[in-house]
Amino acid sequence: MALHLTTAGESHGPGLTCIIEGLPAGLEIDRGALDRDLARRQLGHGRGGRMKIERDKVDVTGGIRHGRTLGGPIALQVANRDYANWEERMNPWPVPAELAEVHLPRPGHADLVGTQKYGLTDVRDVLERASARETAARVAGGAVAKAFLGALGVSVFSHVIQITGVRAPRRDDLEPIDFAAVDESPVRCLDADAGRAMVAEINRLRKANESLGGVFEVRAFGLVPGLGSHVSWQERLDGALGQAILSIQAVKAVSIGDGLEVAGLPGSEAHDEIFYDDERGFWRQTNRAGGVEGGMTTGEPLVVRGAMKPLPTLTKPLRSVDIATHEPAEALRERTDSCTVPAAGVVGEAMTAFVLADAYRRKFGGDHIEDVRRALQAYRERIGWRPR
């Protein structure tokens, strides 16, 4: 049984919708946990003025009754409070006023190619859906996926490891407890010194009318070995994770484990040697593979990184062309953030959680959450694996 997640809605439209299909009945859902993840997505030094307007909360319109899933599609909605300021321009129905079209595509955004592909004359018809505001719906859905994983002993976290050239020291020994206070950092960085340097870098480049990119890392703990498969490229878990992380707006690269770093190492230094003892079963001293070998989880923590480019909406616009007149012009000026890497980490959590939840559904099936637990326990006993 596969899991499906679909979102709908525009950045300044009435709201965003997320529909999740494939979760079992009987799963407990905490509305507060969903709202907390939505609030976490709005965190981070370098956010723009819209974060002062939106106070995202989730409304459930189907699939959950009295805090438990029913087994059918789950429908979630997140209202756009800013729609009150855009109602005329973003109304789903015709309005009497004649509205000026936007003809100035931004380099690095979906604007130009979107108008070409869909035969549109107004860039706003593209940018509203392409906006990262859409990820609020994904985070809401990802929070439901995290609830499912949590019921199976799996936890998912994220932190920022780099903003422009400022990088936090590498940590290979992270445990779930280490993430308890990550959201107290203004850039969601676990290293206090690096976090302060990142804040200073954001301030410096924001004054120069620049935007900033960086790298976030997602870690998942408690995963059973064998999620995914080696037998078909479509079933390889690392392929699904790569697609999910790359689908996040402005993410340009993804790595699992040491990723590109192992390309520069000899084979004897690139892999994780295997050990066995009666207490732990099979185990590895290192985790260069990031918890995935041959397209399958190994039982070690999953480590996924996403590299985000600087946002393409700039307060000092780049050169562009008016799509109506074909004359040179500056790109569109639009309200924007300077840096959203901390928020992207929260979105990365949601997307990773969805992929992992889908992998558990495909492997263990079940119409009720207790069916899933029993199937998981039987599998653990068969392979002799104990959660660490």
Language-model segment annotations:
Residues 1-388:
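Generic N-terminal targeting/processing segments that precede catalytic cores or assembly contacts
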